[in-house]
Amino acid sequence: MHTGLHSRLGALTLLCLLPMSASADFLADSQLSLETRNFYMNRDYRDADKPDTPRFRGLPKAKSEEWAQGFMLRYSSGFTEGPLGFGVDGLGLLGIKLDAGRGTSGTGALQVQRDGEVSDEFGFFGPTAKARLGKSVLTVGSHAPTLPVAFRNDTRLLPQTFQGAQIVSNDLDKLTLTAGQFRATRLRNSSDYEDMTMFSDGAGGGVASDRFNYAGVTWAPSSSLAATYYQAELKDNYRQHYANLLHGLPLAEGLTLKSDIRYFRSTDEGHTTVDNRNLGAMFTLMYKGHALGLAYQDQEGDTGTPFIGGGTDPWTLNTVTFHHFLRAREDSWQLRYDYDFAASGIPGLSLMTRYVSGDNFEIGGQDAREWERDLDIAYVVQGGPLKGLNLRWRNVAYRGSHTTDIDENRFIIGYTIKFW
């Protein structure tokens, strides 16, 4: 495991070296906030006789259930004055168990001990040093990336983080260049950094790795058109190419067609057997608060699309609340509907529901199918002393051939305090 001690010392050293005369922008542009998140999750295993049913001390579980309180303290400094500016960011995380009975761990929200029980609390501190030259920013330390080839997971109590270095440049007009290397990851329910692993259905030969290299470019000639390309490598596991086209087409007053096309090509690296081509397209009609989307995802090759294991979210179109629909050779389609109730005079209230179905794959040599139905209802308080308080209910039903069926509910209450 990696403790992050060197990055902490580096950040503290940088702070000490910053000249007081150059700290005007460093302090004036700084921000400090505290996000609180109350998280409850219940996952009911509908059939406990399947090979993939989670177990506790050898016996199949009937459910996983946890309730916890999370705190996320975020500090972001400005940059020192001059052509080359320096700054420091910091992320402090604390998760506290409120309730988790014996044998009900496993939602991914709380830290699990070796005996299968959960810790009463767990925490993490991650500093990040940064430097800016022109419109290019270099960051070294803890990151919470939202990259198509490495997307941090933030679907439970606390967010996942990665340790490494990244540079983002906007010096060229309409172009964003990104490159970096991650050396370790901290899972969403952990206090420590560790080596990265690969998940790819049907693939063999994966090993723990301390190198994830990536580089990409996004070209956005207008607000309605963007094209992206990334290349990535999890050393000794897989190589991956990613291409994406986003386009918004006005059809009539208030009516827009949004197109989102994504392609992944993944091959082996080291001694793995990764071989996957993933092409997905989603088309969404948007009109006065309504959004109706239809997606189709086709996979070819001997394995499923690979991604960094441990809860990292693959940036594929049919990765949804519970399942990712990335089994080897699996094809899947999605129907989604969103509604913003501000169009009906109720600002802050929103609804999302979707249905995803996958087939054309095998489990244990047998033909299989699966589907998932999701429902999200969220509300953000618009005024008064609780302005900004957000409440969300997530409901999931998953059914599949030769797999454990689940029904799931999540209740999330969040509030952010901005100190400055």
Stretches found by the model and what they are:
Residues 24-25, 77-79, 130-133, 169-171, ...:
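Residue-level signature of outer-membrane beta-barrel architecture
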Residues 25-45, 84-88:
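Transmembrane beta-strand segments of Gram-negative outer membrane beta-barrel proteins
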Residues 28, 65-71, 121-125, 159-163, ...:
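Residues that define the transmembrane beta-barrel architecture of outer-membrane proteins
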Residues 32, 82-86, 135-139, 174-178, ...:
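Repeated loop/turn-to-beta-strand initiation elements of outer-membrane beta-barrel proteins
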Residues 38, 138-152, 177-179, 215, ...:
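Transmembrane beta-strand segments that form the barrel wall of outer-membrane beta-barrel proteins
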Residues 75-106, 115-195, 217-225, 293-301:
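Outer membrane beta-barrel
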Residues 175-201, 206-208, 254-332, 393-411:
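Outer-membrane beta-barrel translocator/channel fold
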Residues 215, 335, 375-379, 405-420:
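Outer-membrane beta-barrel "beta-signal"
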